[in-house]
Amino acid sequence: MTMPEYKAPLRDMRFLIDNVFDFHGHYAALGATDASPDMVSAILEEGARFCENVLSPLNRSGDEEGCHFDNGVVTTPKGFKEAFAQYVEGGWHGVAADPAYGGQGLPQSLGLVLSEMIGSSNTSWGMYPGLTHGAMSAIHAHGTPEQKDTFLGKLTAGEWTGTMCLTEAHCGTDLGLIKTRAVPQADGSYAVTGSKIFISAGEHDMSANIIHLVLAKLPDAPAGTKGISLFIVPKFHADSGERNAVHCGSIEHKMGIKASATCVLNFDGAKGFLIGEANKGLNCMFTMMNHARLGTGMQGLCNGEASFQGAIKYANDRLQMRSLTGAKAPDKAADPIIVHPDVRRMLLTMKAFNEGNRALTYFTAQLLDTAHLSSDAAQRQDAEDLLAFLTPICKAFMTDTGLEVTNHGMQVFGGHGYIREWGMEQLARDARIAPIYEGTNGIQALDLLGRKVLGSQGKLLRGFTKIVHKFCAANAEHPQFKAFVAQLNQLNGEWGELTTQVGMAAMKNPDEVGAAAVDYLMYSGYIILAYLWLRMAIAAQAHDDVEFAKAKLATCEFYFKRLLPRTAAHRAAVEAGSECLMSLPAEAFAL
């Protein structure tokens, strides 16, 4: 009666890497020769061993103990600091980092493969290196040569960690309202004053220094988001080692991810350094935010995978009632619950979302590689356009479905799923934050429909639908999947029609975009997973593991027959328009 032990799903990961997405051909085309098949295999094997043996055993205990706060000092749960030291010593922190600053220079996709295993084994622990990688990407993209030399080496080595400090008590989504101020100093630095809340890994004992990336406004800044600048504010000064004027005021007591320190940070004239251009800080921060949003989307997959592993074991062991078609285990008091159709429904839903979301993660990861490594400018731009389109979908669709998966995992356990000792409720609690932070899923949906799709006059959407159309044309006469290909092709066409419909309505009433956004995003996500499930099913037919292939084909069929029909409900909601949402006056919601 303990939390399920995580086992990295290496067979499925290898299937995607080798059979579906051809990572090796992908790396060769990009000139990433260091990412050899042997290197990829070693990262999978050794990464799995570290996550299974070091991180997974700390997941339950970390949740039970949580972080400790004492007069501004935060201590992580027992074993966390030692695990981070092992992680750093093993070179894992710099797998995809720039070799110029001590990294291994492997493609971003391999970093995400590793991140999945970390997040599945221990979501809270994974927050500490995850936020650091985001800070590294922002400094690498926008920092001066001196800033890169000062900070990236230590961050890459894991000697220092990083944060991003956006939210204040009065503003989360609307960053234009921030009150934190940065006053220029004679030496070219800035005195940063203000308070930030909900800062993940804002204070802890796992690294010698913490490098905060802080949004603040200059004294003469324009109003709103056009007046936001970004500053590097170290906990300890990089040159002298003296403590900077930034301190943790408290840590939050949360529903989940309890072993991740969520801090209130007070900046009292702390010495900071402008990164990027003045008043262009949001552009710099979005480099970090996009990295974080992909990582957050993956948290839906990670908690879902851990929940699924617990649920399938329990469903095979738990004996309750007899099968409706006759006893399946007549020598036992009852049949295992996995024989019951409703338990199968839940398990297959979990499996379909997990494996579909993993495919979406790997598909997106390859685009990251192309955007960073391709020598072809047009190819890089195409990849960046697809990334812009897919990022809000990855973040929102994967976290919403991941939450559904963890709820199913609890339900498979029945009453035991609600009891702490089994560990299933922790996974649901840990998963619940993912649709909220790094931009709520409602905001992701608004970004997708309003900015990415309609804002590009449909260009970004067409970039993806062309891929699907080409795939459908190539497989229209597939002997086994012809009907599913036709279903996907029809939805792919309707996707554009629905988009035009919303765009026309929005010209008359902008509320139409906000009213349609969430359902539009979910509609989009289901179509994208349908495309990926067909790719997996076709690839599985040639797989040498017959039982694995059968499971893929059966899950694809389940997805098309049981989950993809949800698109009809989402489309109907989009077409219903805004009036039924907005006609009721705000006063009518009063108690």
What are these regions (language model features)?
Residues C67, F80, Y128-T132, G143-Q185, ...:
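Internal maturation/activation junctions in enzymes
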Residues Y101, V113, G455, F471-L591:
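C-terminal amphipathic alpha-helical interaction region
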Residues M1-G126, T150, E579-L591:
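Amphipathic, small/basic residue-rich leader segments at the start of a protein or domain
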Residues S189-R243:
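A short core secondary-structure module
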Residues F198-S200, F236-G249, K254, A261-A292, ...:
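A glycine-rich, basic-preceded beta-loop-alpha segment at the flavin cofactor/substrate interface
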Residues P4-K7, G91, I257, F363, ...:
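Alpha-helix capping/hinge segments and adjacent helical runs
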Residues G31-D34, E64-T76, C284-H291, G295, ...:
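Glycine-rich cofactor-pocket loops
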Residues H133-A135, T144-Q147, F151, T440, ...:
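A structural-propensity feature for long, helix-poor, extended segments
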